[in-house]
């Protein structure tokens, strides 16, 4: 009799914990969706990438570290910038729904042939990662990135995705957004950037802390020219206006 009672008690405790876990999971899911909805209308004061950079600096005792981040509406950014970002990072941005399966397939194909496995993240995925998640590589983070990307594409227009991307992308150590980068490295505002300037900013995005916008090396000069050619082939800023 005692064993039956104990067994029923164990089953009851398990059910309580399962129910609590389910409630926590549902609340977390709803909160994440609410985050996405809020930032559809509210400009983010910081991103998780910026928070992570602050923590990294403090852990290294860099007490004087400062972020350079100035929000700039897309209307106040030169038309050359969005198309340069798309040409550099995600040329199918107007057409996909957050995931570029062709790019993923091509990346895996190159890797299977012995090439380096390059990322195939879309601009939408990069926004999800930079705005809401931590740095690093893990299946958990990648899964959450996919979750946030789905809701971003559902609730945000492409224009809003590109606007937030242009503002939270890192262009140098502690320098976030086109406006801050333009002022710090090029001595002008985001509204005054020409095609060459925009391509030069976009060229460092694979490794913004490794490359220098003010003193570009051969690779950045080559990549900047390539981005300008790609932007023209896509049709310039009209490529984004049409979609």
Curated annotation (Swiss-Prot):
Pathway(s) this gene product operates in, as recorded in its UniProt entry: Cell wall biogenesis; peptidoglycan biosynthesis
GO cellular component: peptidoglycan-based cell wall; plasma membrane
GO molecular function: pentosyltransferase activity; peptidoglycan glycosyltransferase activity
EC number assigned by the record: 2.4.99.28
Reaction catalysed by this enzyme: [GlcNAc-(1->4)-Mur2Ac(oyl-L-Ala-gamma-D-Glu-L-Lys-D-Ala-D-Ala)](n)-di-trans,octa-cis-undecaprenyl diphosphate + beta-D-GlcNAc-(1->4)-Mur2Ac(oyl-L-Ala-gamma-D-Glu-L-Lys-D-Ala-D-Ala)-di-trans,octa-cis-undecaprenyl diphosphate = [GlcNAc-(1->4)-Mur2Ac(oyl-L-Ala-gamma-D-Glu-L-Lys-D-Ala-D-Ala)](n+1)-di-trans,octa-cis-undecaprenyl diphosphate + di-trans,octa-cis-undecaprenyl diphosphate + H(+)
InterPro entries: Glyco_trans_51 (IPR001264), Lysozyme-like_dom_sf (IPR023346), PBP_transglycosylase (IPR036950), Pep_trsgly (IPR011812)
Keywords recorded for this protein, A-Z: Cell inner membrane, Cell membrane, Cell shape, Cell wall biogenesis/degradation, Glycosyltransferase, Membrane, Peptidoglycan synthesis, Transferase, Transmembrane, Transmembrane helix
Top-level class of the enzyme under EC nomenclature: transferase
Compartment(s): Cell inner membrane
Superkingdom: Bacteria
Membrane topology of this protein: Single-pass membrane protein
Keyword Transmembrane helix found: yes
Transmembrane domains' residue ranges: 21-43
Function comment: Peptidoglycan polymerase that catalyzes glycan chain elongation from lipid-linked precursors.
Protein family (similarity comment): Belongs to the glycosyltransferase 51 family.
Protein name: Biosynthetic peptidoglycan transglycosylase
